[in-house]
């Protein structure tokens, strides 16, 4: 186990290139299972979750070569359809094995997935969609067995716009016989990346970026070369970090077309940034003050399925609000345990009221003091790291494996931006 030792009080700024989106990289890597030809993926972040997925592919017999942020994957055949629970325990995204396996190999046997502790994540929508296509499901001893002799396209309305369920159904449907229509589909940028990658392999997916996808099944997919989009969670985290520490920051290759609503939400906290076709610019001397709603009411910031404000930035919004003059209600609608990390911010001196599992009221500006903190999940971990940079004195962030599940080369990238941080073995 390792920790970060952080010295607070320094400006974070300079120039950085956005990493690839973890939530796009994982399904795109697993989509390589759908062809026996070579798939080349560019801009793949070097993070723990990617390493676990590659370990799974190695274990089943895939050929993988990595050079920097480029992956070459070829899956001529596999040696088994049973996935070791030592892998699935580590990563929630292992659920994305279902679609590719049942589509190309006709069977998968895997344990229920692990991952974050931010709340319950239903699997019902995955099973509904895959079974509508003709798969047969059985469960025993916390293991999932999914089989299909043949998949046939179907029309379906998802009971929730689940990102991973949508991705699983897409990956199963592209090689199914006939047409599939998915209504109430997720349309996040990472879902769009997966669809665009599959189309570059010969799939026929219409409606990309909308909540209705039409998939015309094809008999075979080819190899491809595809570049993963930027990680807008990393970009959002860096915007907060620069603004709260008074730094000036340029984030290159940030895919800012996805930042319209994110920009609006940040502006309600007094954080303003600019962007052009590729880059995001955060200026120093931000006026960090809550903008009240009409009539002088306390503003509410909430999340929802895309294009609403992304749930993965809600933890970042909480720590940001501690450094902004005024009061704001943060309403996490999607996960009932995401807000439980705020006790650690309160320990540092933040003025936060946890109203219930979904809502917190934050009043700023608070003077934070360095402390010893443990990262409960990837996004809360980054929020605590931001708090440590804002705080007076030294902080220790423990369980940094969680942060490194989603953020690439954290220490070196932050040092290059002027941060005082080092990684050490935990006592």
Swiss-Prot record:
CDD domains: UdpNAET
Gene Ontology CC terms, in alphabetical order: cytosol
Pathway entry: Cell wall biogenesis; peptidoglycan biosynthesis
Positions of UDP-N-acetyl-alpha-D-glucosamine binding: 92, 312, 334
Subcellular location(s) per record: Cytoplasm
Keyword Transferase part of the UniProt annotation: yes
Gene3D superfamilies named in the record: Enolpyruvate transferase domain
Catalytic activity: phosphoenolpyruvate + UDP-N-acetyl-alpha-D-glucosamine = UDP-N-acetyl-3-O-(1-carboxyvinyl)-alpha-D-glucosamine + phosphate
Annotated phosphoenolpyruvate binding sites: 22-23
Any one of the GO BP annotations: regulation of cell shape
Molecular function GO labels: UDP-N-acetylglucosamine 1-carboxyvinyltransferase activity
SUPFAM superfamilies the record matches: EPT/RTPC-like (SSF55205)
Main location: cytoplasm
Active site: 116 (proton donor)
EC number from the UniProt entry: 2.5.1.7
Enzyme superclass (EC): transferase
Family under the similarity heading: Belongs to the EPSP synthase family. MurA subfamily.
Function: Cell wall formation. Adds enolpyruvyl to UDP-N-acetylglucosamine.
Name of the protein in question: UDP-N-acetylglucosamine 1-carboxyvinyltransferase
Gene name of the encoded protein: murA
């Amino acid at each position: 186990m390792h920790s970060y030792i952080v010295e607070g009080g320094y400006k974070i700024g300079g120039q950085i290139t956005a990493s690839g989106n973890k939530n796009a990289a994982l399904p795109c890597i697993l989509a390589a299972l759908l062809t026996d030809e070579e798939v080349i993926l560019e801009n793949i972040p070097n993070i723990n979750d990617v390493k676990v997925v590659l370990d799974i592919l190695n274990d089943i017999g895939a050929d993988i070569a990595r050079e920097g942020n480029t992956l070459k994957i070829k899956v001529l055949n596999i040696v088994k359809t049973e996935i070791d629970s030592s892998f699935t325990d580590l990563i929630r995204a292992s659920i994305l094995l279902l679609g590719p396996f049942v589509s190309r190999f006709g069977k998968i046997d895997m344990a229920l997935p692990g991952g974050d502790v931010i709340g319950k994540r239903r699997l019902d929508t995955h099973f509904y969609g895959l079974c509508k296509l003709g798969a047969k499901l059985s469960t025993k001893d916390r293991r999932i067995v999914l089989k299909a002799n043949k998949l046939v396209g179907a029309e379906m309305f998802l009971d929730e716009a689940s990102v991973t369920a949508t991705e699983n159904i897409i990956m199963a449907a592209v090689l199914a016989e006939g047409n599939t229509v998915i209504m109430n589909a997720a349309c996040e940028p990472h879902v769009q990346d997966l669809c665009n990658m599959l189309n570059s392999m010969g799939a026929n997916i219409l409606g990309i970026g909308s909540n209705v996808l039409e998939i015309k099944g094809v008999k075979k997919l080819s190899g491809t070369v595809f570049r993963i989009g930027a990680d807008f969670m990393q970009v959002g985290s860096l915007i907060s970090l620069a603004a709260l520490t008074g730094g000036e920051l340029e984030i290159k290759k940030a895919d800012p077309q996805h930042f319209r609503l994110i920009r609006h939400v940040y502006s309600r906290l007094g954080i303003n940034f600019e962007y052009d076709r590729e880059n995001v610019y955060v200026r120093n001397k931000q006026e960090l003050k809550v903008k009240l709603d009409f009539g002088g009411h306390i503003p509410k910031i909430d999340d929802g399925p895309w294009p609403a404000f992304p749930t993965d930035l809600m933890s970042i919004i909480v720590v940001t609000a501690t450094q902004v003059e005024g009061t704001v209600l943060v309403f996490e609608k999607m996960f009932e345990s995401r807000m439980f990390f705020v006790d650690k911010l309160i320990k540092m001196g933040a003025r936060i009221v946890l109203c219930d599992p979904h809502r917190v009221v934050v009043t700023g500006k608070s003077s934070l003091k360095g402390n010893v903190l443990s990262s409960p999940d990837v996004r809360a971990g980054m929020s605590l790291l931001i708090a440590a940079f804002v705080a007076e004195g030294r902080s220790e962030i423990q369980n940094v494996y969680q942060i490194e599940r989603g953020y690439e080369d954290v220490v070196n990238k932050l040092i290059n931006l002027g941060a005082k941080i080092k990684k050490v073995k935990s006592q």
